[in-house]
Structure formats: structure tokens, C-alpha cells
Amino acid sequence: MLVVNVSRTWPLVPGDMSAEESVLGDWAALNEAKLHQYGDAIIAVADGTVVAAYDIQGWERLENGRVRFAGRLSGRWAPLIGMPSPVTWTQGAARPVRYL
């Protein structure tokens, strides 16, 4: 499972960015081996709370090296929504992705 920090992009104002774009959007510096090992689900965290959960159906590496996921809302991980994040980030942390 990947846990991503979407605090900067989570759609607080409808129309700015969809939840799907925020969570599945383009992520930098993801290792191929770790994608294969942990790439079954993606949990999104905003301000310390789980806000979305997706089952990953696939992914593509873009020309700029970033990874874009394809996925669907997860029934299995949906109960985590509204719960505290399973991982923590320190303020100013550069890596918005954690592997769990």
C-alpha cells in the first residue's frame, strides 16, 4: 500500500482539482520495485486524516519520470476514511509518499 500526503492538493474548493486527480495524479521519484511490491492500494492523507482510498488497477510512467495511477474507489480500505493517518510526516518533509 502507498500512503500519499495530499494536503496541498486535496480539493477543498470544488472545481480546482478532483479527488481522483489529487490522489492518483502524477507522483515523482517512485521506484519500480517498490511500485510492484506496494502498488495494490493508495491511501490519501490530508492534514493527518485519511481522506480517500483507491485500489490501484495500474500505473504508467510519464515522459517526465512521474507516475500516474489508474484506480477505483476501494471498498476494502474505505473504512480508513476519516481515521488518523497510519503514517506521519514532519512539517517540510520532501517525500509525500510512504510505503506501508
Predicted regions, residues:
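Compositionally biased, charged N-terminal/linker segments
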Residues: 1-39, 45-50, 76-100
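Short, solvent-exposed secondary-structure boundary/capping segments
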Residues: 61-74
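Short beta-strand-centered aromatic/proline hotspots
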Residues: 51-60
